[in-house]
């Protein structure tokens, strides 16, 4: 097995040749409007309108336009958020294809329809509230621009529904359940070795080693690196530092060779979540992580540039999505440096990419 060069300490790193909530904004600053309406028992139609005078090129990844069963809306019942059963994905944010965008002309609208029973546990039925807030990354150009230049903020109306439990129960879950009775390596996150080629297994083991080292280094740095903590998490309070240290240590334990393994990690996709652009994804309600082909082909083991995506921080990012590692599990509230650092303190603390970016910044001294 190809072994990556490493220093002896766990903090030493293997070196190689880098729908969501957003900060509250006045309505006049929003470039888009989103209205939710019900078209069936649990079927939701989102109407997205460009309020401006210029065309918008809207990135679909991890937004209400996403074709994957990601978290497009928040669903509440009796003041408590309903269990999410879909996927949380990390997307490749460089060299974006025009196919990943939806172009919306001035004052024009587009509709997106999805069934919330496919990604939420609505088997109890009853009254629920559905809403969406977040940002949609926008690109410059007239229909084919792919360089992200801004973010369109939105906050939808609140939609009240009375769900028929029998009808909701008849809707198939988008991601289903995974049979975990397979060959595994058990002394950390459980790698499903039956899903791995030799080269994939070596890459994943290296990424887990680096994820542990990055996370441990971040945990140790957080109490001293208050400027960097403030940059990514907007607070240096005692509770914030305590939470960061605890969560990074938990990721390090789950990633390292001496853990009991509370998650299961697959080298390849068995749940059909690896659509174009997906690096890896997590099923948070099952504590399962899946790597996609471009995780191996398009990412270096470790980044050499600040805020660049790599295998190690992608694995770290996915670890924070698992409720067995971080509770409550982190969501995808802001992607990349610009979006992640625009979040509020409470949002950043629950944003998976904020942890990946902070760990990268500590490692490279960004």
Swiss-Prot record:
GO terms for biological process: proteolysis. Its EC number is 3.4.24.39. Residues 20-188 form a propeptide. Binds 1 zinc ion per subunit. Zn(2+) binds at residues 317, 321, 332. One of its GO terms (molecular function) is metal ion binding. InterPro entries: Fungal_M35_metalloproteases, MetalloPept_cat_dom_sf, Peptidase_M35. This is Neutral protease 2 homolog MGYG_04094. It comes from Arthroderma gypseum (strain ATCC MYA-4604 / CBS 118893). The lineage of its organism: Eukaryota, Fungi, Dikarya, Ascomycota, Pezizomycotina.
């Amino acid at each position: 097995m190809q072994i990556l060069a490493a220093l002896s300490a766990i903090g030493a790193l293997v070196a190689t040749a880098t729908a969501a909530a957003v900060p509250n904004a006045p309505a006049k600053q929003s470039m888009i409007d989103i209205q939710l309406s019900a078209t069936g028992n649990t079927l939701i139609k989102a109407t997205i309108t460009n309020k401006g005078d210029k065309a918008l090129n809207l990135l679909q990844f991890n937004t209400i336009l996403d074709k994957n069963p990601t978290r497009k809306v928040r669903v509440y019942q009796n003041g408590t958020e309903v269990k999410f059963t879909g996927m949380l994905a990390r997307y490749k944010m460089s060299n974006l294809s025009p196919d990943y965008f939806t172009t919306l002309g001035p004052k024009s609208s587009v509709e997106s329809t999805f069934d919330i029973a496919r990604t939420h546990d609505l088997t109890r039925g009853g009254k629920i509230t559905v809403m969406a807030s977040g940002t949609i990354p926008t690109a410059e150009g007239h229909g084919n621009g792919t360089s992200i230049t801004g973010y369109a903020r939105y906050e939808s109306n609140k939609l009240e529904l009375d769900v028929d439990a029998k009808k909701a129960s008849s809707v198939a879950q988008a991601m289903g359940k995974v049979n975990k009775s397979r060959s595994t390596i058990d002394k950390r996150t459980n790698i499903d070795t039956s899903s791995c080629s030799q080269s994939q297994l070596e890459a994943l083991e290296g990424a887990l080693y680096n994820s542990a080292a990055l996370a441990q280094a971040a945990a140790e740095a957080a109490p001293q690196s208050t400027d960097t903590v403030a940059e990514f998490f907007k607070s240096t309070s005692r509770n914030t530092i305590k939470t960061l240290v605890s969560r990074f240590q938990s990721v390090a334990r789950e990633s390292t060779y001496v853990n009991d393994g509370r998650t299961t990690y697959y080298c390849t996709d068995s749940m059909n979540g690896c659509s174009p652009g997906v690096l890896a994804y997590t099923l948070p309600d099952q504590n399962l992580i899946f790597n996609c082909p471009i995780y191996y082909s398009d990412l270096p083991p470790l980044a050499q540039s600040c805020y660049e995506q790599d295998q190690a921080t992608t694995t770290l990012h996915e670890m924070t999505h698992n409720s067995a590692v971080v509770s409550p599990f982190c969501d995808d509230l802001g992607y990349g440096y610009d979006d992640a650092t625009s979040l509020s303190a409470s949002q950043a603390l629950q944003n998976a990419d904020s942890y990946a970016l902070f760990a990268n910044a500590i490692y490279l001294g960004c």
